[in-house]
Amino acid sequence: MTTAAPTTSTLTGVPALAPLLARGALLSPLRRPRPDADFPRTRLVLPGLRVDLTRLAAYERACGFATGADALPVTYPHVLGFPLAMRLMSGRDFPLPLLGLVHTSIGITRRTALPATAEYELAVHVEGLAPHRRGTEATVVTEIRTGGDLVWESRSTYLARHRTTARPPAAGGTPAGEREPLPARAEWHLAGDVGRRYGAASGDRNPIHLHPLTARLFGFPQAIAHGMWTVARCLAEHGTPDAAVVRAEFRAPVLLPGTVAYGAQDGRFELRGGDGGRRLHLSGEVGPYPAA
């Protein structure tokens, strides 16, 4: 993966998402993605950030977290960082097309519980690009600090699909999609408005999540659930320690409306189709930080 030390740009407010998404859509046809392309070397920093408790409560309700808790859900800082990530990924110097970009994985490290009423410094940068067997993958890093201490960080990978000669690394063990399903703990019947409710709470109003008509424009037969909603919903059910490490991989889209089965065993969790579990939508694991 290509890496470089980023320069710092300090923001005075949260970027508005709508114009960023529009700019990214307009620039997408001009992109020619490749793993050796240059990428933005800027680290965006937003100091003095406070959480909007009304939006937080809407997010908690949409994802199944208990409302009114003193601490932020483990996935919520991703929502806080999303506008900064979109500012970087919609810019002219980001080489991958925003339209069609697929969120493939997220890794989260939370070093302590994050009070909902605290003041934070938010920072986001693109760590690098890497070849993928289906195209080019970008890694975007989000960090949360309070009092100068790093308390939460994530690494998200986003895939731009294109023709490539890259060979996949040799795989060890059984692919996740071919493993025996984890013990089923719950079956969830998902309404058609899950994407709209999560989009309103998170700000991520990608048209593939909002309505069947807009989803069909991008090749989906129905609206699909946000990947980050699926992992948040699973973690709301599973629970996480105050200091935790989370890793999740997004395997296949969840069509809305639909039925899914939540499975879990020890620190592992997954989401499978309600068709007997043949289709794996999400796999992940959660454990303590630091690891025992």
Language-model features: where?
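HotDog/MaoC-like acyl-thioester-processing domains
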Residues: 1-30, 34-38, 83-86, 104-190, ...
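Hot-dog-fold acyl-thioester-processing enzymes
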Residues: 2-105, 168-241
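A conserved acidic, glycine/proline-rich C-terminal tail/linker
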Residues: 234-262
